[in-house]
C-alpha cells in the first residue's frame, strides 16, 4: 500500500532528503529541463528550509511522489521567485499554502504498480486532504501547461 504522510523539513532524515532531492533533480532538471539549482546530483533551493513541510508517498520503503508546502505569508516561489511575472495580484496572507515541486517518479511507479495505478490522482486527493485537515482555506500553485491538463482531468 502507498503510504502518504507529511514531514517538516527538520524531520527529514539524511537518507530520505537525499532521495527526495535526487528525485527532484531527475524530474525537474533531467526530464523537464527546468532552470533549477542542482548540486551533488540533487535539486533544492532556498525554500527548502525550516518553514517547509513535505507530503511524501512511500511504497515498500521507496519514495514515489512528493510535494512541498509553504504557508503563503512566508517566502515562497509565488511571492518571491515568480512575483515579477504577475501584475499587482493580491494574495491572502493567512489560511493558504503554496504547493510546489510536485512530482511522481514515473519509473518507480511503473515498476512497483504497473501502468494502471492512479498515483497522481491519489496524491492530488492527499494534497487536498492535507490542506483541509490542517485548517487551510486553499492552496495556491503555479503549474506548467502539462500539469494543468493533469489537474483538469483530476476534477
Feature names for model-found ranges:
Residues 1-43, 54-56, 63:
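Short amphipathic alpha-helix that is part of the acyltransferase structural core
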Residues 26, 73-75, 105:
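Short loop/turn segments at secondary-structure transitions that flank enzyme active sites
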Residues 42-46, 147-149:
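Beta-rich nucleic-acid/ligand-interaction surfaces
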Residues 45-56, 74:
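A short helix-loop-beta-strand connector motif used in the catalytic cores of GNAT acetyltransferases and
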Residues 50-52, 64, 92-97:
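Short connector loops at helix/strand junctions that flank enzyme active sites
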Residues 60-90:
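Short, His- and charge-rich active-site/binding loops that engage polyanionic ligands
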Residues 82-155:
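Acyl-donor binding region in acyl/amide transferases
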